[in-house]
Curated annotation (Swiss-Prot):
GO molecular function annotations of the record: RNA binding
Expression sites by tissue: Chylomicrons in the plasma.
Signal sequence range: 1-48
Protein name as catalogued: C4b-binding protein alpha chain
A Pfam short name: C4bp_oligo
Compartmental location: Secreted
Length: 597
């Protein structure tokens, strides 16, 4: 089929291909006619005409019979606010503009409901605002329940807006009377109890209250009144008197202990408390916490050293307590000597035990060997040792069958006079430590005298002059004892105060008030002219219950002992009670006198 001819024009084939498919869609047989129809339909929009006005949520046309579907440019339609809205602009119109659109300013806004007011014992929660369509919620304070609606909405009412539900009420929650308990009672006497009300329970005599003495009316599930906590019980509870070895009761004396009775403990000297010093009788008839233990923190029970005695003054006993580091010196009894050359001391160690000691062994006198003589009599002390001759033994002997002599075994293992012999010649005199003697012969002594002298720094103890008689020296050799200077001590004093001390003198350190001994409290002048152990120091001690106010200053701030404060308060309370009784007595006397008059 050939395309039609167009008068006075030319046919563009490309445009035909574009128009022809639409003509088929709309069932138009002539493409030219289809194009003309399409232009006619689009022409009003191009020229600015508007379609139907939009539907507004806040307003409606004043002419409710409006039926037109096309409006010319410049057309103005008047509107009125819908219920729940109020006019906010003087112009309430929509206008069709040249673009074919309806234009307008928002001219109606939500109306607002009045504030519902305060809810007594409750709260009003405004979610957004009080405008038309908004919702508020009501709730009651704890212990109150709500009567009425929990919500209310701002809605249209008559010609305005109002709340859909009135303000509710909050009523207080009530509890039934509290439960009764055996062997006890409560303080309440009402039929009902308001939320928050409390009652107190008490037990009959000889019964103890277990649990909380007071319970209160509370709320459950926002409306139900319940008592909390659970009511107590009244039981008979007693605890046995606790036994704390090496401990002492500070308070809480009594043969019987009931529920919640309290005992306060302290430990004896030399022991430290492990556990709680305060315990109370618990509901299970047991002490809570468990009674404490007193563990030793010092050395006790002095070691028993056979054939020895202690040098410390005053002499220690088995009941004494010694801190770690304490040094005690022992001395062998006459007739005994130290087993070794080590110091005869014991020291309290950190493990609270005394250092091992060697002890003392028997010191025997030698058997006399007499030339031209014989032992005529022997008196023995018979101790339990291996010695043939021991301290205190006495022998009598004769020389040349004419002269008779006697000798006694001394504590140092020598005979007095010196080892018995028959003859006029004396042996060399004994040498002494830290000293010497003057002699007239280098071989033997016959009716001679010697004089002992001590080295510098030592003093002679015993007879300085000895003479030889019948082969014996007139006396045992003296000793040179060391001299120790007075210990230098700051903030303390010595039990014996002098310029020099003779071995083995012992002194005790006593610190001034507020100072404590750091080191051994007892020291001894030793053979090398020094003090053993070293001289301790007296250092400042912070009193118990006090604290240092200024660093580097001995300015302390102390709090009173709680037990002293408690005792003072009890005494003050007793004085007030006595004063009250005296006033009552005087008042009774005055009343009696008035009646007699």
């Amino acid at each position: 089929m050939h395309p039609p001819k167009t008068p006075s024009g030319a046919l563009h084939r490309k445009r035909k291909m574009a128009a022809w498919p639409f003509s088929r869609l709309w069932k138009v047989s002539d493409p030219i006619l289809f194009q003309m129809t399409l232009i006619a339909a689009l022409l009003p929009a191009v020229l600015g005409n508007c379609g139907p006005p939009p539907t507004l949520s806040f307003a409606a046309p004043m002419d409710i019979t409006l039926t037109e579907t096309r409006f010319k440019t410049g057309t103005t339609l008047k509107y009125t606010c819908l219920p729940g809205y109020v006019r906010s602009h003087s112009t309430q119109t929509l206008t069709c503009n040249s673009d074919g659109e309806w234009v307008y300013n928002t001219f109606c806004i939500y109306k607002r409901c009045r504030h519902p007011g305060e809810l007594r014992n409750g709260q009003v929660e405004i979610k957004t605002d009080l405008s038309f369509g908004s919702q508020i919620e009501f709730s009651c304070s704890e212990g109150f329940f709500l009567i009425g609606s929990t919500t209310s909405r701002c809605e249209v009412q008559d010609r305005g807006v109002g709340w859909s539900h009135p303000l509710p009420q909050c009523e207080i929650v009530k509890c039934k009377p509290p439960p009764d308990i055996r062997n006890g009672r409560h303080s309440g006497e009402e039929n009902f109890y308001a939320y928050g009300f409390s009652v107190t329970y008490s037990c009959d005599p000889r019964f103890s209250l277990l649990g909380h003495a007071s319970i209160s009316c509370t709320v459950e599930n926002e409306t139900i009144g319940v008592w909390r906590p659970s009511p107590p019980t009244c039981e008979k509870i007693t605890c046995r008197k606790p036994d704390v070895s090496h401990g002492e009761m500070v308070s809480g004396f009594g043969p019987i202990y009931n529920y919640k009775d309290t005992i306060v403990f302290k430990c004896q000297k030399g022991f430290v408390l492990r556990g709680s010093s305060v315990i109370h009788c618990d509901a299970d008839s047991k002490w809570n916490p468990s009674p404490p233990a007193c563990e030793p923190n010092s050395c006790i029970n002095l070691p028993d050293i056979p054939h020895a005695s202690w040098e410390t003054y005053p002499r220690p006993t088995k009941e004494d307590v010694y801190v770690v580091g304490t040094v005690l010196r022992y001395r062998c009894h006459p007739g005994y000597k130290p087993t070794t050359d080590e110091p005869t001391t014991v020291i309290c160690q950190k493990n609270l035990r005394w250092t091992p000691y060697q002890g003392c062994e028997a010191l025997c006198c030698p058997e006399p060997k007499l030339n031209n003589g014989e032992i005529t009599q022997h008196r023995k002390s018979r101790p339990a040792n291996h010695c043939v001759y021991f301290y205190g033994d006495e022998i009598s002997f004769s020389c040349h069958e004419t002269s008779r002599f006697s000798a006694i075994c001394q504590g140092d293992g020598t005979w007095s006079p010196r080892t018995p012999s028959c003859g006029d010649i004396c042996n060399f005199p004994p040498k002494i430590a830290h000293g010497h003697y003057k002699q007239s012969s280098s071989y033997s002594f016959f009716k001679e005298e010697i004089i002992y002298e001590c080295d510098k720094g030592y003093i002679l103890v015993g007879q300085a002059k000895l003479s030889c008689s019948y082969s014996h020296w007139s006396a045992p050799a003296p000793q040179c004892k060391a001299l120790c200077r007075k210990p230098e001590l700051v903030n303390g004093r010595l039990s014996v105060d002098k310029d020099q001390y003779v071995e083995p003198e012992n002194v005790t350190i006593q610190c001034d008030s507020g100072y404590g001994v750091v080191g051994p409290q007892s020291i001894t002048c030793s053979g090398n002219r020094t003090w053993y152990p070293e001289v301790p120091k007296c250092e400042w001690e912070t009193p118990e219950g006090c604290e240092q106010v200024l660093t580097g200053k001995r300015l302390m701030q102390c709090l009173p002992n709680p037990e002293d404060v408690k005792m003072a308060l009890e005494v003050y309370k007793l004085s007030l009670e006595i004063e009250q009784l005296e006033l009552q007595r005087d008042s009774a006397r005055q009343s009696t006198l008035d009646k007699e008059l």
